[in-house]
């Protein structure tokens, strides 16, 4: 089979944006930052013109200057790329691929509320952030994931939503080092053929920890610990369609640990290099078999079995880093 295609399209894009800062009246003032804008585009391939307004406001209240409240909303468009406009149709055993010039950009309306709190504990800086979001989606282009292959349906066939909560505590548990803990909850689904199904990226929860510490009595030796636990992604048998993604992979679990030694520090000397670190990491410390995808095997009775493909097991990594 051989095919030659020539596509000539024109895309015009632009945006307008402004920021307005003001403060409330009174002896104790609250400070506001209002950011608003408009983005527009036109694509000659499908003749679509999109206009997406968006705005955000942040407030530092008078009762505590270490607190920031944020809210943002807007209408967003994601233009389709080549694999999304490619529509494959099989008729009488013949597979035909066409480019869908009637396709539209995927649309999303965002509502995001956030809270930041900066504080000190034992004279060390910390920051706690919380963000809740809801995104209403239209004209979605669904896709199937089979192992590492992604196949798009080639048309706007779904509506959906994404809602979630992200929490993060960031700070210097040890002076001069960065550590954080994050916790996320999410639900993202799409309605296809009258049925709500999870999107391929529907990861319902995730916990991540990054902790750095120095050895007692010296700052030349540094230890880093990383932990991750996340919900497994939905999947189903190949060629069964998104409506039958009724299974979910096991949770992803991983622990990494690393040791670093500072070979050089500039200090007060004149040098282009600030410091040099030599480190060794043990990735996937406990050798957990995390599932990447599934290979489906069919027996003589047409019964299918999912055989897991695993991600990389335990590995040792040596690195040399220079900071200029």
Feature annotation, model-predicted:
Residues 22-32, 62-67, 120-126, 175-176, ...:
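Short loop/turn motifs that connect adjacent beta-strands in outer-membrane beta-barrel proteins
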Residues 30-36, 53, 67-71, 111, ...:
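Transmembrane beta-strands of outer-membrane beta-barrel proteins
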Residues 6-12, 49-51, 107-111, 159-163, ...:
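Residues that define the transmembrane beta-barrel architecture of outer-membrane proteins
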Residues 24-28, 133-136, 155-235:
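Gram-negative outer-membrane beta-barrel transporters
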Residues 6-44, 50-54, 58, 169-187:
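Surface-exposed extracellular loop regions of Gram-negative outer-membrane beta-barrel proteins
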């Amino acid at each position: 089979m051989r095919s030659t295609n020539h596509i000539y399209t024109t895309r015009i894009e632009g945006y307008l944006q402004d920021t307005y800062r003001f403060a409330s009246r009174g002896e104790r003032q609250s400070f506001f930052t209002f950011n608003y804008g408009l983005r527009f585009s036109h694509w000659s391939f499908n003749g679509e013109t999109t206009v997406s307004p968006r705005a955000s406001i942040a407030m530092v209240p008078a009762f505590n200057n270490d607190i920031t409240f944020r809210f943002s909303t807007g209408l967003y468009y994601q233009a389709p790329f080549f694999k999304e406009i490619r529509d494959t149709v099989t008729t009488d055993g013949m597979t035909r691929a066409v480019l869908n010039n009637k396709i539209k950009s995927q649309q999303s309306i965002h509502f995001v509320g956030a809270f930041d709190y900066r504080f000190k504990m034992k004279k060390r800086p910390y920051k706690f952030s919380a963000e809740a979001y809801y995104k209403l989606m239209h004209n979605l282009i669904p896709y199937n994931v089979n192992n590492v292959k992604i196949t798009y349906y080639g048309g706007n066939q779904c509506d959906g939503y994404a809602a979630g909560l992200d929490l993060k505590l960031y700070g210097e548990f040890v002076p001069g080092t960065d550590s954080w803990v994050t916790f996320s909850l999410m639900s993202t689904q799409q309605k296809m053929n009258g049925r709500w199904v999870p999107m391929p990226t529907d990861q319902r929860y995730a916990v991540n920890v990054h902790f750095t510490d120095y050895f007692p009595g010296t700052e030349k030796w540094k230890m880093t610990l990383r932990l991750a636990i996340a919900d497994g992604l939905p999947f189903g048998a190949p060629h069964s369609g998104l409506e039958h993604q009724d299974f979910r992979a096991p949770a992803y679990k991983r622990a990494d640990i690393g040791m670093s030694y500072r070979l050089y520090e500039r200090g007060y000397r004149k040098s282009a290099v600030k410091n040099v670190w030599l480190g060794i990491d043990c990735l996937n410390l406990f050798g957990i078999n995390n599932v990447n995808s599934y290979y489906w095997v069919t027996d003589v009775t047409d019964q299918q079995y999912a055989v897991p493909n695993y991600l990389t097991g335990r590995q040792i990594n040596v690195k040399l880093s220079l900071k200029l």
